[in-house]
């Protein structure tokens, strides 16, 4: 059976794990790290960097280095959250033809799924390197509070990366899975998973039950905020530094993308340091300059100051906890364990707020960076048939329904309904002799249709003429295990039906996905060629260096014609490595190797002679030492003190 890998596709960092024979392992990336920054850089010449290499060059390539693309996934350009991010991001966010928020880098228009696919591809390659076989299937996690458009867009990202996404599961559910399977006991427990990541916040109340040796994970309720996370905490600190610097120097750093990128790195580092220390210093020399010369930024930030800057963000995470508990029909006293997930949950003030709300100390034995990927890998092993001792019952985070007369939303599936699920309801026409109806699918909790998220619409035509209210139109909502919605409508009088899988009024079309898959495959081929070119160039340069050194040491022992031949081959090889033609580099390196063969023989002969001379000298020295040995008389001394 093919291996199904588990991927936590995070806003700030991503993580990869695999589960085999009941054992789960987090897999290191090409740089040897267990997590990969979700940062993608587009360079001149078409090269794409992902992860730490992309992050390292961000300051000098701010406009073409994309981070936190997950915050844009499945979003319209006009969404207020996107508009808020436009002001703080150094790269350009644009409006796509379908109204979605896309990104522009190196003159190319890129969709968020396309950008996220680069991270997924890096994960896929790391898994293949570890397993030594091709990987095509994955379980990918998403925030529990992701709507249908965002889930669909995440699946699209997987396809573009060459992965068949077997299941989309919610991040808190995955973390609970990792926690529950790690516990050897058979105790039933109710857990609250507080997941404050880089860009999103989720809270899920999950019941872990032991059923004859198998474990059932049932999500009782979930809530959250898809625009609340570590990036927002960083931004508060960045805004504060910018304001203070403006007061002191009269210069607005918001206008300088390079300064913004340096500030982002410094703020992230300061935030991490303040989780263990009471104070940190931000030092950014030459941050900018004006007519009077260069300006330096030096500022002390205390933990108390930082906490005051983000106080309301922490408070914002507590309200969804209250709602989730209420929806689950539980009180804080019913919760056995509180699990913290996501890097931002390491902040002491966040932990204090969680402890105060739930009335108990959150558990510290769950790795907040890796638990989600581990849970995804466990679910991957279940789906591949590798284990059957786990049953996962997840829920839909938001209510689903259609727009009905008067612009109201009529709900067919309530939030926190266990999935997969199906629901049907009969509707009718609003006018006499109406020949068609438009089914407008919505997701959200508001009564007014326009206040909810529009997922898409479709028409059911050829309705037989009849007075209003007479035709019977049955609308069926069907949510699969990924939380993705399929909607159908049927005229019960004529039997005519229409249906769609919701891809949202936004989202990528099938043609766009196919094109992006082809682009990605072409890119993979380009990457392979680049790797081969670099390897050839490195080998050639090593040979050039070696020949030059040997020529300097032994060149005077060669006849003039031989030396000239080597120097000519050297020059040609040096010219070749400056170019990008792998064939030419290989050919010139081979020619240099042939031309310098005699020189190589000379170096080898000299080395042999030196080695033999060394051995002779050592033998002589050893013999001399033997001659110097003096026989000595000795007598045994008895120790009377014993």
Curated annotation (Swiss-Prot):
<keyword id="KW-0143">Chaperone</keyword>
<keyword id="KW-0547">Nucleotide-binding</keyword>
<dbReference type="InterPro" id="IPR029048">
    <property type="entry name" value="HSP70_C_sf"/>
</dbReference>
<keyword id="KW-0067">ATP-binding</keyword>
<keyword id="KW-0346">Stress response</keyword>
<dbReference type="InterPro" id="IPR043129">
    <property type="entry name" value="ATPase_NBD"/>
</dbReference>
<comment type="function">
    <text>Acts as a chaperone.</text>
</comment>
<keyword id="KW-0597">Phosphoprotein</keyword>
<dbReference type="InterPro" id="IPR018181">
    <property type="entry name" value="Heat_shock_70_CS"/>
</dbReference>
<dbReference type="GO" id="GO:0051082">
    <property type="term" value="F:unfolded protein binding"/>
</dbReference>
<dbReference type="GO" id="GO:0140662">
    <property type="term" value="F:ATP-dependent protein folding chaperone"/>
</dbReference>
<protein>
    <recommendedName>
        <fullName>Chaperone protein DnaK</fullName>
    </recommendedName>
</protein>
<dbReference type="InterPro" id="IPR029047">
    <property type="entry name" value="HSP70_peptide-bd_sf"/>
</dbReference>
<dbReference type="Pfam" id="PF00012">
    <property type="entry name" value="HSP70"/>
</dbReference>
<comment type="similarity">
    <text>Belongs to the heat shock protein 70 family.</text>
</comment>
<feature type="compositionally biased region" description="Acidic residues">
    <location>
        <begin position="628"/>
        <end position="642"/>
    </location>
</feature>
<dbReference type="InterPro" id="IPR013126">
    <property type="entry name" value="Hsp_70_fam"/>
</dbReference>
<feature type="modified residue" description="Phosphothreonine; by autocatalysis">
    <location>
        <position position="200"/>
    </location>
</feature>
<feature type="region of interest" description="Disordered">
    <location>
        <begin position="608"/>
        <end position="642"/>
    </location>
</feature>
<dbReference type="InterPro" id="IPR012725">
    <property type="entry name" value="Chaperone_DnaK"/>
</dbReference>
<dbReference type="GO" id="GO:0005524">
    <property type="term" value="F:ATP binding"/>
</dbReference>
<feature type="compositionally biased region" description="Low complexity">
    <location>
        <begin position="608"/>
        <end position="621"/>
    </location>
</feature>
């Amino acid at each position: 059976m093919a291996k199904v890998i588990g991927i936590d596709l995070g806003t700030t960092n991503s993580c990869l794990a695999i589960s085999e024979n009941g054992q789960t392992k987090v897999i290191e990336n090409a740089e040897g790290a267990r997590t990969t920054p979700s940062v993608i850089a587009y360079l001149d010449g078409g090269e794409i960097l992902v992860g730490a290499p992309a992050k390292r060059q961000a300051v000098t390539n701010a406009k073409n280095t994309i981070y936190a693309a997950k915050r844009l996934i499945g979003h319209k350009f006009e969404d207020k959250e996107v508009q808020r991010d436009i002001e703080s991001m150094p790269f350009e966010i644009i409006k796509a033809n379908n109204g979605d928020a896309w990104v522009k880098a190196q003159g190319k228009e890129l969709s968020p799924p396309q950008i996220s696919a680069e991270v997924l591809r890096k994960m896929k390659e790391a898994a293949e390197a570890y397993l030594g076989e091709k990987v095509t299937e994955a379980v990918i996690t998403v925030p529990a509070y992701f709507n249908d458009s965002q889930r669909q867009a995440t699946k699209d990202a997987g396809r573009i990366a060459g992965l068949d996404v077997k299941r989309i599961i919610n991040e808190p559910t995955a973390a609970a899975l990792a926690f529950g399977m790690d516990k050897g006991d058979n105790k039933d427990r109710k857990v609250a998973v507080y997941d404050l990541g880089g860009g999103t916040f989720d809270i899920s109340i999950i019941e872990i039950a032991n059923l004859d040796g198998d474990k059932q994970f049932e999500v009782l309720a979930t809530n959250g905020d898809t625009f609340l996370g570590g990036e927002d905490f960083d931004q508060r600190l960045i805004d504060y530094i910018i304001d203070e610097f403006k007061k002191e120097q009269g210069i607005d750093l918001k206008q300088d993308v390079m300064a913004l990128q340096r500030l982002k790195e410094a703020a992230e580092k300061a935030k991490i340091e303040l989780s263990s220390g009471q104070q940190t210093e931000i030092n950014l020399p030459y941050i900018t300059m004006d007519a009077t010369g260069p300006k330096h930024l030096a500022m002390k930030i205390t933990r108390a100051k930082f906490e005051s800057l983000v106080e309301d963000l922490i408070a914002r995470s507590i309200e969804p906890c209250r709602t989730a508990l209420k929806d689950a029909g539980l009180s804080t006293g019913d919760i056995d364990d509180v699990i913290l997930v996501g890097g931002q949950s390491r902040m002491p003030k966040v932990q204090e707020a969680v402890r105060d709300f739930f009335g108990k100390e959150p558990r510290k034995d769950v790795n907040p960076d890796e638990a989600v990927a581990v849970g995804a890998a466990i679910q991957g092993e279940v789906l591949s048939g590798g284990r059957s001792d786990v049953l996962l019952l997840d829920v839909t985070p938001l209510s689903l329904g259609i727009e009905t007369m008067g612009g109201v939303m009529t709900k067919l599936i309530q939030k926190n309904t266990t999935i997969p699920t199906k629901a049907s309801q009969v509707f009718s026409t609003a006018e006499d002799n109406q020949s068609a109806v438009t089914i407008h699918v919505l997701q959200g909790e508001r009564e007014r249709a326009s206040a909810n998220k529009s997922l898409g619409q479709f028409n059911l035509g050829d309705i037989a003429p009849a007075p209003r209210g007479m035709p019977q139109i049955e609308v069926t909502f069907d949510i699969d295990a990924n939380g993705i919605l399929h909607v159908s409508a049927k005229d019960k009088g004529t039997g005519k039906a229409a249906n769609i899988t919701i891809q949202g009024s936004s989202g990528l079309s099938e043609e766009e996905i196919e094109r992006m898959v082809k682009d990605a495959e072409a890119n993979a081929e380009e990457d392979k060629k680049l790797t081969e070119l670099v390897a050839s160039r490195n080998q050639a340069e090593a040979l050039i260096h070696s020949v030059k050194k040997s020529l300097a040491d032994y060149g005077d022992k060669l006849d003039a014609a031989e030396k000239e031949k080597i120097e000519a081959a050297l020059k040609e090889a040096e010219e070749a490595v400056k170019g990008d033609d792998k064939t030419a580099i290989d050919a010139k390196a081979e020619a240099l190797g042939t031309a310098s063969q005699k020189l190589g023989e000379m170096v080898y002969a000299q080395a042999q002679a030196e080695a033999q001379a060394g051995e002779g000298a050592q033998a002589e020295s050893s013999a001399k030492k033997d001659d110097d040995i003096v026989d000595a008389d000795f007598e045994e001394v008895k120790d009377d003190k014993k």
